[in-house]
Amino acid sequence: MQTRNTLSWIKEEITRSISVSLMIYIITWASISNAYPIFAQQGYENPREATGRIVCANCHLANKPVDIEVPQAVLPDTVFEAVVRIPYDMQLKQVLANGKKGGLNVGAVLILPEGFELAPPDRISPEMKEKIGNLSFQNYRPTQKKILVIGPVPGQKYSEITFPILSPDPATNKDVHFLKYPIYVGGNRGRGQIYPDGRKSNNTVYNATAAGIVSKILRKEKGGYEITIVDASDGRQVVDIIPPGPELLVSEGESIKLDQPLTSNPNVGGFGQGDAEIVLQDPSRVQGLLFFLASVVLAQIFLVLKKKQFEKVQLSEMNF
């Protein structure tokens, strides 16, 4: 009887442990999935404002370059590469959320013309799959197939990102025409300086919220500082909280001004945006051009032959 009770107790404990572990996994996975890949998805219906500015610049304040390469023209219902390059110095290390230093991550948003979309896996060639690697692209919104996002992903491996794009066919999509279209891109390297809710991250400079004397600097156990400033005008104490990461620039007893930097700016990344143009080419126009070029070549050949024939006739007449 005692053995049966013991086995029953062990079974209950194992079941409880599995349930707790499963709950922890689900909660952890949910928090991670909600945080990635693009913060802008949480607060903006469209990543490109009416002014042309891509909203990622609201959180990534430093301006850095980005480059996009696409074919000059594509045929309908064709898979092509849109290559986005996010250059940066691979030796750089960024401040992580815990205040430690680590490698930079990168991310990108690609805004395609109407009708263009991510190519289905069965249409992607093995060579293109090799260039894509293990990247997983997603739509900015389920209903917006023309806007693609990726990241954050390790910058050491993916500073060049290849998007596989499928061009539309005007024969099946009446909203698409054979025209020249713009493509917009935004790319960032490193963490942002501001979270979507307006809070500062630890990857930015912190300024004094009052003018006065630094009366106390308390180094917190888990990193960061509490800086007490005695206001010069009324003697009240103001406490500025500095998270782990930025390096302190002031010391106790120092006189500081309002908005004076209390820390260095640890940010080594930034955001950039660019654009390119692509022509959706009508196959019949291409065929017409080829026919025209072929006719020109044939005309030139016949002209040369005719000229040689004429020269032979002249030569024979002279000999006669």
UniProtKB/Swiss-Prot annotation:
One Pfam short name: Apocytochr_F_C
Transmembrane segments: 286-306
Protein topology in the membrane: Single-pass membrane protein
GO cellular component, one term: chloroplast thylakoid membrane
Free-text remark on how the cofactor is bound: Binds 1 heme group covalently.
Domain of life: Eukaryota
Cofactor requirements of the protein: heme
Keyword Metal-binding belongs to the record: yes
InterPro entries the UniProt entry points to: Cyt-f_TM (IPR024058), Cyt_f (IPR002325), Cyt_f_lg_dom (IPR024094), Cyt_f_lg_dom_sf (IPR036826), Rudment_hybrid_motif (IPR011054)
Keywords from the named record: Chloroplast, Electron transport, Heme, Iron, Membrane, Metal-binding, Photosynthesis, Plastid, Signal, Thylakoid, Transmembrane, Transmembrane helix, Transport
Record's subcellular location: Plastid, Chloroplast thylakoid membrane
Record-level GO BP terms: photosynthesis
Keyword Metal-binding: yes
Entry binding sites for heme: Y36, C56, C59, H60
Molecular functions per Gene Ontology: electron transfer activity; heme binding; iron ion binding
Signal sequence bounds: 1-35
PROSITE patterns: CYTF
Subunit structure: The 4 large subunits of the cytochrome b6-f complex are cytochrome b6, subunit IV (17 kDa polypeptide, petD), cytochrome f and the Rieske protein, while the 4 small subunits are PetG, PetL, PetM and PetN. The complex functions as a dimer.
PANTHER family: CYTOCHROME F, PTHR33288
Function according to Swiss-Prot or TrEMBL: Component of the cytochrome b6-f complex, which mediates electron transfer between photosystem II (PSII) and photosystem I (PSI), cyclic electron flow around PSI, and state transitions.
Record family assignment: Belongs to the cytochrome f family.
Name of protein: Cytochrome f
